[in-house]
Amino acid sequence: MAVNILESNMGKDVSQWFETASVDRYNLLKEYAKENRHHMTDAEKALWNILRQPKCSYKFRRQHPIYDYIVDFICIEKKLIIEVDGAYHSEPQQQEDDRIRTETLSNMGYKVIRFTNEEVLSNPKVVLRTIKEELS
């Protein structure tokens, strides 16, 4: 699925809205995404603060619907998805689900990188450096 960029005139400014799922799926997932934004983990909050810094130089969205998924973070311009994995991602079934999810998103042209909660919280500089390398 391609990313469609639709521009709409919002007063004097023109803003961009990104459609990354079918309209029906997007409308369903956006409600879950909104809820997720209000209940972020400590690691997700920490990474969001990193991604919002001017040092990052690219715009990221958090809890964004793509296809059948809600990704933790995405830079649409660079087609980079960042997932922050909690402890349950070490469970065999979740690892298989994550593999399928990553493969599906990769087949759609996205690069998916993953960090554990511990990596984000204990090594934020390393996480930022890794993200910057992926963006360049």
Regions found by a protein language model. Name each.
Residues 1-58, 107:
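Solvent-exposed, charged helical/coil patches
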Residues 36-40, 46, 62, 67-135:
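Basic, amphipathic alpha-helical patches used to engage nucleic acids or provide basic targeting signals
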